[in-house]
Amino acid sequence: MPLHNLTRFPRLEFIGAPTPLEYLPRFSDYLGREIFIKRDDVTPMAMGGNKLRKLEFLAADALREGADTLITAGAIQSNHVRQTAAVAAKLGLHCVALLENPIGTTAENYLTNGNRLLLDLFNTQIEMCDALTDPNAQLEELATRVEAQGFRPYVIPVGGSNALGALGYVESALEIAQQCEGAVNISSVVVASGSAGTHAGLAVGLEHLMPESELIGVTVSRSVVDQLPKVVNLQQAIAKELELTASAEILLWDDYFAPGYGVPNDEGMEAVKLLARLEGILLDPVYTGKAMAGLIDGISQKRCKDEGPILFIHTGGAPALFAYHPHV
C-alpha cells in the first residue's frame, strides 16, 4: 500500500462516508462522452465543499497544538474561509478571517450575501485588508496581534493549501480509486487549480493509485507559468511528508480563467447553466464553472488523452451564486 503513511497524521472525522461518485447521463449525452462527477460539493458542513477534507487534517493539528483560535485569509466570497469558520464553530474555537475584495466591486450582493453572509452566522471576526499581496506574512502579523490579546492562534494558509492540508486530497484519491475499481476506467480527471492543494494532493494520490489516468488542472487565477511552480512545490512537499516519490507531470490549462480570479466569464456561466439544466447540479462562477468550461472545450478541441470517461471533481462553491447575482 503506497499511501500507508497517511494514517500517521492526526485527522478529525468531519466527512464520514465517501462522497458520491456519479454518472451524468444527460450531460454525457449532450457532450458525446461519458462524464462522471465526484460530489465534494455535498460534504456535510456549511453547504459543502472541498476544503473540509483539508480541514480534517489542519484542525486536528490545531487541537494538538492547543489552539483556541483559527486564523485564515481569502476573498470576501471565499469558500475556504466559510468552511474554516464552520469548523471553528463546531469545535468551539474562535475564528478570525482576513478578507480582501479582489475584484474591487461595490455590489451589495458580493459584499454581504453568499459566503460573506454565512461568516456572520458562524460569528467570525472579520479583518479587512486592501489586498492579500503576501498572505503568509499578513497572516503571521495578524496571529501576532491575536496572540497579544491572549488567544492561542493557529494559522491556516489560504485555501488550506499546505502539505498537511493537501493530504485531504491524497485521501480523496484513495476514495476515488476504490469507487472506480471494477466499475469504470477513468481516462482523465479534471479539477479546478487555484491555491493548488486539491490539485497537488490528487496528483500524488492518483499517480500511485490510478497511474493510467491523466489529471488536468484548469487554472482559476493564474497562467501556467505562475501556477505550475505552486502545484509542483506542493506535490513534492506532500510526497516528502508521505515518504514516497512524486514524478507525475503536472498538466495545466490556463485558457478559461480570464479576465481574472473571481470575475465571471461567459464560458464559465454557460457551464453553470448547462449542468443546472441538464443534471440539477449547481456549479459556481469562480472555480467549478470555469473548470467545467475547460472540460467542455477540452472535449471539443480533443485536448484529453483519448476518448475515454472523464471524471470532474466538484469542489463546491454554490453559495457564491447568490453573491454574483445578477451575473447568474
Swiss-Prot record:
The keyword Zinc does not apply. It is an enzyme of class 4 (lyase). One of its GO terms (molecular function) is D-cysteine desulfhydrase activity. Gene3D superfamilies: 3.40.50.1100. One of its GO terms (biological process) is D-amino acid metabolic process. It catalyses: D-cysteine + H2O = hydrogen sulfide + pyruvate + NH4(+) + H(+). Its cofactor is pyridoxal 5'-phosphate. Its EC number is 4.4.1.15. The modification N6-(pyridoxal phosphate)lysine is found at residue 51. It holds the Pfam family PALP. Keywords: Lyase, Pyridoxal phosphate. It comes from the Bacteria. Catalyzes the alpha,beta-elimination reaction of D-cysteine and of several D-cysteine derivatives. It could be a defense mechanism against D-cysteine. Belongs to the ACC deaminase/D-cysteine desulfhydrase family. Homodimer. This is D-cysteine desulfhydrase. It comes from Escherichia coli O17:K52:H18 (strain UMN026 / ExPEC). The gene is dcyD.
